[in-house]
């Protein structure tokens, strides 16, 4: 899969997922306590006095330079699928996947971060809040990332 295909796949996924959430939530996909730092993610009808606001899907502001800095900080390159996941839209998922808001675009990845796992070929990207499990990409078959499983 090319970078363009990975990004289009993620774009299609997010748009369908949020559309489904909006249908289930009577027009509201996700409600979150959003502050001023994430104002770009507020839906247009949000009241600034309310702590909880409807979260709208917006294009990611994460740049290639941001990804390069993250990769340098964590000591490994991101597979295309995770790169696309982080760079197509700012999004929110329940744990363990977590959120990717404007104010902290790598929040979920940093929350799951464990250098020992990376040293042994696993890239953590999601962590259950209760600490019961970490979701990782098995990097054993890189650069053939289509053969890299999720564990």
Residue positions per predicted region:
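Compact, glycine/acidic-enriched structural inserts
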Residues: 148-151
């Amino acid at each position: 899969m090319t970078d363009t295909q990975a990004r289009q796949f993620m774009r299609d996924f997010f748009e369908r997922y949020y559309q489904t959430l909006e249908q289930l939530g009577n027009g509201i996909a996700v409600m979150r306590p959003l502050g001023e730092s994430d104002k770009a993610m507020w839906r247009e009808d949000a009241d600034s006095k309310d702590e909880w606001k409807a979260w709208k899907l917006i294009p990611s502001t994460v740049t290639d330079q941001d990804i390069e800095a993250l990769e340098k900080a964590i000591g490994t390159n991101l597979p295309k699928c995770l790169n696309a996941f982080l760079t197509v839209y700012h999004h929110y998922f329940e744990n363990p996947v977590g959120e990717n808001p404007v104010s902290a675009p790598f929040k979920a990845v940093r929350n799951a971060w464990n250098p020992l796992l990376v040293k042994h070929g696993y890239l953590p990207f999601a962590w259950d809040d209760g600490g019961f499990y970490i979701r990782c990409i098995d990097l054993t078959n890189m650069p053939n990332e289509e053969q890299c499983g999720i564990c």
